[in-house]
């Protein structure tokens, strides 16, 4: 459902989208940004043999990284530079090479300084891991302050 957070300035939306899609770790993992809006994001990747642990299962670090990437796009989607300060993850099911993992980050709450997110990682709509995380919202604006209207900067 659209809301006022989705009303980013068009030039800012495109530049943020380009920036998010250039994420080096996302590229290294072969992941794809499916969607983002302020406070929300969805990232997807298929587990490859290079993503496995010594037992042959998908490495938990890959799932953690996908969740962290999704949360970073959700929290930075307002244009204010945000960095993760804490992430807790629980692994519910193993994953194998060939499994496609979708990491969906959703904002739980946000203040001027901190935002809290829930991240669900699924394979075929089945929950394989879940996480919660906190981001610190700096006073710096991605793309510089001039691209963001005053009312946007005051509100977000």
What name fits each language-model region?
Residues 1-156:
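Terminal targeting signals and extreme-terminal segments of soluble enzymes
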